[in-house]
A protein has these predicted regions:
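Nucleotide-sugar donor-binding/catalytic module of glycosyltransferases
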Residues: 1-233, 237, 338-346
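Helix-capping and short linker residues that terminate individual alpha-solenoid repeat units
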Residues: 30, 240, 283-284
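Active-site activation/catalytic loop segments of kinase-like enzymes and analogous catalytic loops
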Residues: 124, 261-268
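Conserved positions within tetratricopeptide repeat
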Residues: 229, 249, 253, 268-275
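Flexible helix-coil transition and linker loops at the boundaries of alpha-helical arrays
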Residues: 240-249
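Amphipathic alpha-helical repeat scaffolds of TPR domains
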Residues: 250-262
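Membrane-interface aromatic/basic loop that binds lipid-linked glycans or pyrophosphate carriers
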Residues: 268-350
């Protein structure tokens, strides 16, 4: 019998986009599937909208608001699949994503091989999705994957992964103590527990950049900064458990330097710990530098003013792009239908 795949979808205040995400899940060409939606205490109509899809293979649960990790764990505990596909409630799967990954995994003997796939980001129009290849888009060993992620500041979007139940049970549940980068920590742990990553170029993920993504913005939240720091230490621990070498130490220091601006200078406690850890790894962290357009503000108005200005204009640029795409999306869809465009032809879109 062919393996059963469980598509686990955590959702919080997702009524605007969950229809398209569920359509992409239902449209999967792999027939042996179940879809588990976990409404994490939404205050909008997320649960009501999701229940329109309820069927023998689509089950919707509602829970108190406990966060992403708890919602995913709730879904995994109740699913029956041999493989688990996590899908955020505003992202889309290409129709044959799961089928292509399972075809690739059927050619290997171990259930500890982890499947990944290409991903790209879009705002409203999927045909304008940008797929930007990086060095993670290939077959890699666990240590090579973590080295590149941490040493080159790369990542793979959550839905790219297809995880066997055996591998998920070995890696353990999502960490419910983390409030930021809980997905990054979890999949780093899954990678460490795996016997390798099989990259499947035919399957695609469409990652929506929307207002809901602002939940992942760390800002000035000390809870999120504490969580990020814990996740970073775990990343370093996972990589060093696989290999202790000069290249690993260098990648770990680079990784800390990448995220250093989130703590400097407002969290001197974390800054001091990071410097101590960098010294242990035979490295040193330097004060963050700004883009040349903002660096001149630092000696005149101070570090915080430069940081605030850079963050403001970066956010403004992204907001203007999103609003423009929204306007074009409304213009293109208004003459035909008020129903969101079907996602079944995503495979043909670039």
């Amino acid at each position: 019998m062919k393996p059963l795949v469980s598509i686990v979808m955590p959702a919080f205040n997702a009524e605007q986009w969950i229809v398209e995400s569920l359509q992409s899940a239902v449209a999967q060409t792999w027939e042996r599937k179940e879809i588990i939606v976990v409404d994490d205490g939404s205050t909008d109509r997320t649960a009501e909208v999701a229940r329109r899809f309820a069927s023998k293979n689509v089950v919707v649960f509602s829970t108190d608001n406990r966060g992403l990790s708890a919602a995913v764990n709730y879904g995994i505990q109740r699913c029956q699949g041999d493989y688990i596909q996590e899908l955020d409630s505003d992202d889309l799967l290409a129709p044959d994503k799961i089928e292509k990954q399972l075809e690739a995994l059927s050619k290997v003997d171990s259930k500890r091989i982890l499947a990944s796939s290409p991903w790209g980001h879009f705002y409203y129009r999927t045909r304008h999705t940008r797929f930007i290849q990086n060095s993670l888009w290939q077959n890699l060993s666990p240590v090579e994957w973590l080295l590149r992620k941490m040493g080159e500041d790369l990542h793979m979007q959550n839905a790219t992964w297809l995880v066997s139940r055996e591998l998920a049970e070995t890696a353990g549940p999502w960490n419910e103590d983390l409030q930021y980068d809980q997905d990054g920590e979890y999949f780093a742990r899954v990678v460490r527990a795996s016997e390798g990553i099989r990259f499947v170029p035919e399957g695609r993920i469409y990652y929506r950049v929307s207002g809901s993504n602002q939940l992942s913005y760390i800002g000035s939240s000390n809870r999120k900064k504490d969580s990020l720091f814990r996740s970073m230490k775990l990343h370093i621990q996972y990589l060093r458990s696989l290999e202790e070498s000069d290249r690993v130490r260098k990648a770990c220091v680079t990784y800390m330097q990448t995220w250093y601006p989130h703590f400097y200078p407002d969290r001197p406690d974390i800054v001091a710990e990071l410097q101590d850890l960098a010294a242990e790894l035979q490295g040193h962290l330097t004060p963050p530098r700004f883009d040349w357009k903002y660096e001149w503000l630092k000696p005149v108005f101070g570090w915080r003013a430069a940081a605030t200005t850079e963050r403001f204009f970066s956010g403004l640029k992204a907001s203007l792009r999103r609003r423009w795409d929204n306007a074009m999306y409304r213009l293109e869809t208004r003459p035909t239908s008020l129903v969101p465009p079907a996602v079944v032809n995503l495979k043909q879109r670039d």
